[in-house]
């Protein structure tokens, strides 16, 4: 099993419920164990699309036997099951799931970058990672 940190975010619909539903779907996968979830933080949207609702964000510490691409496929499947429609980059979404850190892996492919390249630009992600690291 590999220690992984997942970013979760939502700014459409019942944001809290969307995040908890995504966590429930993660827990239903026998190859994923959700260890801990950070405090939910309300944040301004990032990126060029400014006229959209506030986000609710969290970071989850998980362990998985899935390799990075398999985990990414599971996250995309959960987003799809929860009704996410990808219309515009940086636009509003009912759920967003990102692999932030996957063990000590470094991957730089068009569809997967680990560690997530925006960690340093997202204080809410840094706060969630610090919170979870403090509990270990």
Question: Model-predicted segments: where are they?
Answer:
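N-terminal beta1-alpha1 ligand-phosphate binding loop
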Residues: 1-32, 37-44
